[in-house]
Structure formats: structure tokens, C-alpha cells
Amino acid sequence: HYGGFMEFAATPWTSSARDLLHYMTAIRCHAGQTQIGQVLKHALAESRRARIHALVFVGDAMEEDPDALYKMAGELGILGVPMFLFQDGSDPVAEGAFRRLAGLSHGAYCRFDSSSAEQLRDLMCAVAIFAVGGHAALEDFSRRRGGTVRRLTHTFTHKP
């Protein structure tokens, strides 16, 4: 996570749902410039060490040089690491950048309603299902779940 004044921290990898829940519930929103570039640099470094099936990013703004981010997203795409970007809010600059980052990495973009924990849960489930079972498993989950998951799956599997 990142926040405040140039704060960036990466938790250790875990396969424990309990540990992941602990990490995710400890995250708080702080004012400060976005550090998406730091997240992408970290993902690139980690993906060169071991296989990463997907990168998930939840954010509301983008305040960095988009070209630098697009270059790294393209590298992630080449390495087979799709980015799933979930936008909280309706900032048009963030939306444009998040859509482009998703496209360059062969991932997907979806806006969610910040008042709906269920939507975000479904989106995170969809990414986990993709990471374990690939496109076919994601399509199957999308057919059963519908709604926001179907929108995400459509943007992921139907590229222009």
C-alpha cells in the first residue's frame, strides 16, 4: 500500500486467507500523491523472481506521469501479468489512465461503488478465480454471478 508523504510498503506474499484479510483490513486512506509507479516497479521486480498471475489495484486518482506508467504496464503485459484496476469514484483522469493501464497489461478495468463492499468482494473473487483457473474459470464465475463481475469479465475478454 502507499499513502501519506511517499510512504510505500509491500506485505510479504501469503497463501493464507487470514493473513491477507489482516493486511487488507489494516489499510487506511491517507492524503498524498499517488504512487502507482512504485506499485508497478515492485510488481515488475517480483514477477522477474517468480510467476505472478495478476496485479490488483484499487484507487481513486492518478497523479503521475502516465507515459512512465504505461511503459511499465506494457512490460507487465509482456511478462504475462494482467492488471485488474478497480476505480473508486469517478475521476475522469484516473479512469482514462486506469483503462489504458489495463489494456496495455492485457488486464481489465472496472469502476465500483465505494458504498458496496459486496461489489468489491465479487471483483476480488473474480481475480482470484482467474489467477487459479484462467479465462475459462472466470467466464464460468461471471455467468453465475452476473452484475459487476460480468462487466469486468467482458472488458477482460473482449478487447478492441
What label would you give each PLM region?
Residues 61-104:
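VWA/integrin I-like adhesion module and closely mimicked acidic/polar interface patches used
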Residues 109-160:
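C-terminal "exit" segments of structured domains
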